[in-house]
Protein backbone atom coordinates (compact mmCIF):
# COMPACT_ATOMS: atom_id res chain seq x y z
CA UNK A 1 0.00 0.00 0.00
CA UNK A 2 2.91 2.33 0.68
CA UNK A 3 4.09 2.10 -2.94
CA UNK A 4 0.55 2.90 -4.13
CA UNK A 5 0.42 5.93 -1.86
CA UNK A 6 3.84 6.99 -3.09
CA UNK A 7 2.69 6.61 -6.70
CA UNK A 8 -0.50 8.58 -6.01
CA UNK A 9 1.44 11.41 -4.40
CA UNK A 10 4.06 11.51 -7.15
CA UNK A 11 1.42 11.34 -9.88
CA UNK A 12 -0.61 14.16 -8.32
CA UNK A 13 2.53 16.32 -8.04
CA UNK A 14 3.48 15.45 -11.65
CA UNK A 15 0.09 16.59 -12.97
CA UNK A 16 0.00 19.67 -10.77
CA UNK A 17 3.45 20.77 -12.00
CA UNK A 18 2.33 20.52 -15.62
CA UNK A 19 -1.05 22.16 -14.96
CA UNK A 20 0.63 25.13 -13.30
CA UNK A 21 2.91 25.70 -16.29
CA UNK A 22 0.09 25.65 -18.88
CA UNK A 23 -2.65 28.00 -19.97
CA UNK A 24 -5.50 27.93 -22.46
CA UNK A 25 -6.06 24.83 -24.56
CA UNK A 26 -2.76 23.28 -23.45
CA UNK A 27 -4.04 23.32 -19.86
CA UNK A 28 -7.56 22.27 -20.87
CA UNK A 29 -6.24 19.35 -22.85
CA UNK A 30 -4.29 18.10 -19.84
CA UNK A 31 -7.34 18.48 -17.60
CA UNK A 32 -9.54 16.58 -20.09
CA UNK A 33 -7.04 14.23 -21.70
CA UNK A 34 -5.13 12.62 -18.84
CA UNK A 35 -7.61 9.96 -17.82
CA UNK A 36 -7.81 6.26 -17.08
CA UNK A 37 -5.52 4.92 -19.83
CA UNK A 38 -2.82 7.51 -19.21
CA UNK A 39 -2.92 7.05 -15.44
CA UNK A 40 -2.77 3.26 -15.83
CA UNK A 41 0.26 3.66 -18.08
CA UNK A 42 1.89 5.90 -15.48
CA UNK A 43 1.19 3.38 -12.71
CA UNK A 44 1.67 0.01 -14.38
CA UNK A 45 4.41 0.76 -16.88
CA UNK A 46 6.31 4.01 -16.35
CA UNK A 47 6.37 4.02 -12.53
CA UNK A 48 7.38 0.35 -12.41
CA UNK A 49 10.38 1.02 -14.65
CA UNK A 50 11.45 4.50 -13.50
CA UNK A 51 9.90 5.25 -10.12
CA UNK A 52 9.65 8.94 -11.09
CA UNK A 53 8.24 11.19 -13.80
CA UNK A 54 11.34 13.18 -14.67
CA UNK A 55 11.48 14.36 -18.29
CA UNK A 56 7.99 12.94 -18.98
CA UNK A 57 5.43 15.40 -20.39
CA UNK A 58 1.71 14.48 -20.45
CA UNK A 59 -0.56 15.66 -23.28
CA UNK A 60 2.40 17.18 -25.10
CA UNK A 61 1.52 19.57 -27.92
CA UNK A 62 3.19 19.20 -31.31
CA UNK A 63 2.23 21.28 -34.34
CA UNK A 64 1.58 19.01 -37.30
CA UNK A 65 2.43 19.55 -40.97
CA UNK A 66 -0.80 21.53 -41.43
CA UNK A 67 -0.04 23.88 -38.54
CA UNK A 68 -2.66 22.20 -36.36
CA UNK A 69 -2.05 21.11 -32.79
CA UNK A 70 -1.70 17.44 -32.03
CA UNK A 71 -1.47 16.29 -28.44
CA UNK A 72 0.62 13.20 -27.79
CA UNK A 73 -0.37 11.16 -24.72
CA UNK A 74 3.20 11.55 -23.43
CA UNK A 75 6.55 12.75 -24.67
CA UNK A 76 9.74 11.85 -22.84
CA UNK A 77 12.53 14.30 -23.63
CA UNK A 78 15.96 13.58 -22.24
CA UNK A 79 19.12 14.78 -23.94
CA UNK A 80 18.85 14.05 -27.65
CA UNK A 81 16.01 11.54 -27.21
CA UNK A 82 12.44 12.62 -28.00
CA UNK A 83 10.09 9.71 -27.42
CA UNK A 84 6.36 9.89 -28.15
CA UNK A 85 4.32 7.39 -26.14
CA UNK A 86 0.74 6.66 -27.16
CA UNK A 87 -1.77 4.41 -25.41
CA UNK A 88 -4.27 3.20 -27.98
CA UNK A 89 -7.66 1.76 -27.17
CA UNK A 90 -9.19 -0.78 -29.53
CA UNK A 91 -12.39 1.25 -29.99
CA UNK A 92 -11.06 4.64 -31.10
CA UNK A 93 -7.94 3.32 -32.82
CA UNK A 94 -9.35 0.26 -34.60
CA UNK A 95 -13.07 -0.50 -34.33
CA UNK A 96 -14.36 3.06 -34.74
CA UNK A 97 -11.76 4.09 -37.32
CA UNK A 98 -12.57 4.62 -40.98
CA UNK A 99 -10.06 4.74 -43.83
CA UNK A 100 -9.48 8.50 -43.54
CA UNK A 101 -8.86 8.35 -39.78
CA UNK A 102 -6.50 5.43 -40.36
CA UNK A 103 -4.55 7.40 -42.98
CA UNK A 104 -4.45 10.46 -40.70
CA UNK A 105 -3.06 8.41 -37.83
CA UNK A 106 -0.31 6.90 -39.98
CA UNK A 107 0.55 10.31 -41.45
CA UNK A 108 0.75 11.79 -37.96
CA UNK A 109 3.15 9.06 -36.80
CA UNK A 110 5.25 9.43 -39.95
CA UNK A 111 5.38 13.21 -39.41
CA UNK A 112 6.45 12.80 -35.78
CA UNK A 113 9.21 10.41 -36.85
CA UNK A 114 10.39 12.85 -39.54
CA UNK A 115 10.49 15.59 -36.85
CA UNK A 116 12.96 13.52 -34.83
CA UNK A 117 10.58 11.79 -32.43
CA UNK A 118 10.67 8.08 -31.85
CA UNK A 119 7.09 6.81 -31.58
CA UNK A 120 6.01 3.83 -29.51
CA UNK A 121 2.44 2.70 -28.98
CA UNK A 122 0.88 0.51 -26.32
CA UNK A 123 -2.48 -1.22 -26.57
CA UNK A 124 -4.76 -0.09 -23.75
CA UNK A 125 -5.62 -3.74 -23.02
CA UNK A 126 -1.94 -4.61 -22.49
CA UNK A 127 -1.46 -1.65 -20.16
CA UNK A 128 -4.65 -2.39 -18.20
CA UNK A 129 -3.85 -6.09 -17.89
CA UNK A 130 -0.14 -5.57 -17.26
CA UNK A 131 1.07 -7.77 -20.08
CA UNK A 132 3.53 -7.47 -22.93
CA UNK A 133 4.62 -3.91 -22.24
CA UNK A 134 8.01 -3.61 -23.90
CA UNK A 135 9.16 -0.34 -22.28
CA UNK A 136 11.59 -2.11 -19.90
CA UNK A 137 13.41 -3.42 -22.99
CA UNK A 138 13.97 0.09 -24.35
CA UNK A 139 17.55 0.86 -23.38
CA UNK A 140 17.20 4.65 -23.63
CA UNK A 141 14.29 4.97 -21.19
Model-derived segments and spans:
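Active-site metal-binding core of divalent-cation-utilizing nuclease and nuclease-like domains
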Residues: 54-84
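Short, charged, amphipathic alpha-helix that recurs within catalytic cores of restriction-modification
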Residues: 99-111
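Short strand-loop junctions, especially beta-strand C-caps/beta-turns
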Residues: 61, 88-90, 122-127
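Short helix-loop-beta junction
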Residues: 48-53, 110-117
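Amphipathic coiled-coil/heptad-repeat helices and related helical stalk/stem segments
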Residues: 38, 67-70, 104-105
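Basic, glycine-rich
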Residues: 1-10, 18-19, 113-141
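Short beta-strand-loop-alpha-helix junction that forms the active-site gateway
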Residues: 75-102
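Solvent-exposed, charged helical/coil patches
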Residues: 1-51
Amino acid sequence: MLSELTFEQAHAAFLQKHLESRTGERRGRLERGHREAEKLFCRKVWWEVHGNFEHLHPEYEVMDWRGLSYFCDFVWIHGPVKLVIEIKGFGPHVKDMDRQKYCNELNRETFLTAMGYQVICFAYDDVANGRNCALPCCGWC
